[in-house]
Amino acid sequence: MTGDIDREARRVQVEGTPGIDGIDFVEVIGNYPGSEGFVPRAPVQRTLLVHLLNDAVPADLDATRVSIVGGVRTDPTINPVRVVWAYPAIAVAGEAGSPTLPLPAGVDESDTRLVDGALPSSAAVRRRVLVVRTSSSGDWSTYLLRLLGAGGQGVPDGF
């Protein structure tokens, strides 16, 4: 997308409108040693929380349907930032801090604790969050996260 976008006006139009959804905001969980909520063995700045505006995360929204582009460093250990896994927050941390077992592929108990500590306890909020694990923390430049439609094309239905 290019040009000026009145993000707040767009958000107001989409929020609460039946049959249409969108990304409200993306949160990067820092998980720095010594910080409040630090979880040992959970990665630093590689867990993203993608908050949707209206509806629960679609069950078929997974790592193959999340794209991250951006970054300026040419170091292949940093860029491109790849999506390792992506699951609804309730699959990772449960609706009230106790996920259904077994945990999804690639997710461990430290991920559950990290995500649980970063989200409010509200089941309604947790249902609207997609958790994305990245291959690196990237660099300090701008990145764009996109949700893709079936087959990795376009946008998801209803977005």
Provide a role label for each language-model segment.
Residues 1-159:
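Intrinsically disordered, low-complexity, polar/charged repeat-rich segments
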